[in-house]
Amino acid sequence: QILKTLTRQNAFVTCLNDGQTYRFHHMMKECAFRAFRTLDDSRQAFYYERYGAWYEKHGAYIHALSAYRRNQNFAAILRVVQKDAGILLASLKPEEVLEVLNRCPVSVLKEYPLAILVLMRCMFNWKNIPKMLELKELLLASIREHPKLSEEERGNLLGECDLIQSFLMYNDISRMSQFHRSASEKMTRPAISIRSDGGWTFGSPSVLMMFHRKSGDLDKELEEMNQCMPHYYKITNGHGQGAETIMSAEAHFMRGNFVDAHIALEKAYTQIQGNGQESIALCCDFLAQRLSICMDIKMRNTFEERRKELLQGHNTTWVNIFDSTCAYYYAVTGQTERIPTLFGAHMLSTVNFLAPGRPMMEMIENQVYLAQGEYSKVIGRSESILAMSQALHYDLVALHVQIQLLAANWKLGKTEQALDLLRRSLSQAFPDGILMPFVENYPYIEELLKGSFFGINENFLFRITRMGKEWEMRCDQLKKEEAYPPVFKVLSDRELEITELMAKHMSNKEIAQSLFLSEGTVKQYINQIYSKLQIPGDVRVKRKYLLEMMEGKS
């Protein structure tokens, strides 16, 4: 009743559409918080405890952690960490988590072995391996010393420890699987420290970029994924399900086998339907976007619809991954004005990306710089991105960056450097038949590809060139389709050109002078435009209606 009265009388409080949730303006929240701080410490502590419990109950774990931190309620903090399983925790700054961890008494930590497992994985995500290993020793001590643990649960915890340790072998599929099989032998239940609805890709929009480790080994890596993932699914209740399928689809795409890529993509979409594997779904979306440039496929959602859907999930990681896929799509198709702000305005430094996913984000930002004509920036950044990629054995990411680097060198007139990088990139890609990074950058490297490259298969070069030309034509067609309302597809290029000039309120005479045509010819074109678009009425009404249709395109 108090909230209803406040809502009626105060513009700073609004009731949301669900009729149950209220939003307070930040100014009112600040005033309320200042008033709250005038309460004595015990009263504040009482309410912080209530805040924490309410947020915890409703799954708002970041807010719950914030409330419990103010009370130094470490047991509650660890309970929330265990429930969150590192999903929302990953969005916090590592130093914030470490600061709480360092203040938490060891005796309390030992009471929450599952929270320790979650924190171990977080430390891997943040590249803090010494702390990860320190927590492992604490976990083993906790398992040894815990008086109430059954032998079965000790086995489960030791199995989960093997599971978390597998990340130390990250992207070496067979070595990771050895830990998964060891964990499977010890465990009688699915892992608790990894929730099946949590992210699997560390923020990467591509599984293939994560696991293609070495030039010439792609087929071997695909087979290893097929053999190893079932063991991982068994102990994680299907976490990351569909990863091997989308990786196979991506490999087909990289080799220019678009029909096979599309079939595998649809299999992956079917495999993950309704099982909460959003990170795998985003990898599917990324491939679907890239595939839609190369062949006629029906997208499941428009970019705007998909982003709105993700925003409703209140997980910024998913939104950032999707923005990265859109940024790449718009960069390679030359639609720089449509690149999401995070990438278009180069704001990656404001986001806490997990270490294994950062090279992919940096590579995509490099592609954006290339599309924006910032060639010196591309050259200046590429060395550090290549170093990151090589440290993580990201062979495909490194290939993308090398091609971006050679394109930038070529654009700045550094021909020898560009040719050397092209030779290296072709030699790296040929053993696995990887074509698409060259094709997607064909407008930059078309002239360079006309040279002769000793030791490089001629058919491989021919396929890149042929597919590059087709890809460039499809990009031009896509840009035209996306720049106008769907009904404008019936217009020819010349008619679209005249339509654009009409939108600038140019007269028939001005249009004729601009295009070196006679006024009579322009008038004929305009009548054809009206006829094709089925616009009725007199001349003035027709033109007004056409302009309204043009404005509706945005």
Regions found by a protein language model. Give the residues of each.
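Extended alpha-helical scaffolding segments used for macromolecular assembly and cargo binding
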Residues: 34-114
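Amphipathic alpha-helical segments of tetratricopeptide repeats
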Residues: 65, 85, 102-106, 137-149, ...
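Short coil/turn connectors between adjacent alpha-helices in alpha-solenoid helical repeat scaffolds
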Residues: 82-92, 124-134, 166-181, 208-223, ...
